[in-house]
Amino acid sequence: MAGWRTLPAMRWPWRRRNPPLDPWAELALEHGLNVQTPPEGESEDTPFHERFGLAAGRVTHLAESDAAATPQLRVALQTVPSDVRTRVAYRLHLIAERPEPLLPTAWRARAAGHPLELQVQRNSSGGDVVRSGDDGFDAAVHVLSREAQATAGALTPDVRDALAALFVSGRPAGTLVAGGGLLRWTADEEVGPSDPRVGGLMDAFKGLAHLEVLKPA
């Protein structure tokens, strides 16, 4: 019986694969943003912190839309000092700069919660609860402003719908602060770029940021 013949080694054409993106780069790519070098400094008086109203803490990750984009969108991840009460080590910020204010006043909003939480928000902001006249919206979203009457008059159905989408049940807990053309949503819990809830949150925030302001006739 003839012996076995040794077959020559076969060379398989391996395909080169690009290395997987890290979660931050993947989030930026998905939403059309460009990863940027984070700003230096971690105190509240650095230009970046002051411009966007951030508390102390180093910004470790940053992505933003093209400079010519309107509105200008940014996503930032920031480390924060250790807080025994919240146990939050980092915070996610969604930031939009619009050419014109969404509402003519300064205001803030968050999902409706315990009455004590609302009282804390009122004390810290000095604002009053805004009653839009839409009972369903007012029960789901708390809007605070020092100019409550003017803010209420500007809460059109489109604005209410966009805010309700941002604070719908299942979204990460957070607070939206607005003044001038600036909108900034800040997480009240740890939310990382790989969190499955971030995609829907980003879409809702962009919908609010791109909302057109209806001018009086």
Placement of each model-derived feature along the sequence:
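N-terminal alpha-helical "arm" segments
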Residues: 2, 12-13
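Charged, low-complexity intrinsically disordered regions
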Residues: 25-31, 37-217
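Membrane-proximal amphipathic alpha-helices
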Residues: 17-20
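Short, positively charged and aromatic/hydrophobic N-terminal segments
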Residues: 5-6
